[in-house]
Amino acid sequence: KYHTWQTHGDISVSEGVLREWVNNYARNDFYQWAIVFKEYSDKPIGSIAVVENIDETVGKAHIGYCIGKPWWHKGIMSEALGAVINFLFDEVGVNRVESRHDQRNPNSGAVMKKCGMKFEGTLRQSDRNNQGICDACYYAILADER
């Protein structure tokens, strides 16, 4: 409900996005994953990514994620976010992983908290999503806080 991108108008748009992702996997700084069930790995139910380039000056990665409504409140997103946080600390070597959510979407904040991220504050009218201009709640975890 609180996406920062427009929904795809038809399947050709989705196919184009997926082609772009596949092409970008050749880059060393592209971090985008589909979320799938282990038993049904050909059926994505969500995605998670580093949504801004990693800030090398401070070692910061900003994460964005989404999952289909039928899979809300099942711990799937927390498992995926936790795995990506560990990957970014252990394999990429970042010092800080952060994310944000629309203040009207507290369940996203609950996912972040469950993964050890700490609430850092709300930036008023600092973001835009498909609901319009919104307040953004920021969470982060540092490498030495795991």
What are these regions (language model features)?
Residues 10-12, 25, 131, 146:
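A short hydrophobic/aromatic micro-motif that marks alpha-helical segments and, especially, helix-coil
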Residues 14, 18, 26, 64-66:
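Intrinsically disordered, low-complexity regions enriched in Ser/Pro/Gly/Gln/His and often acidic
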Residues 1-20, 31-33:
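Conserved GNAT-fold acetyl-CoA-binding loop/helix
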Residues 23-29, 117:
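Short loop/turn motifs at secondary-structure junctions and domain boundaries
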Residues 19-21, 125-126:
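A generic local structural motif
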Residues 20-24, 87:
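A generic secondary-structure signal
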Residues 32-146:
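Acyl-donor (CoA/ACP) binding surface of acyl/acetyltransferases
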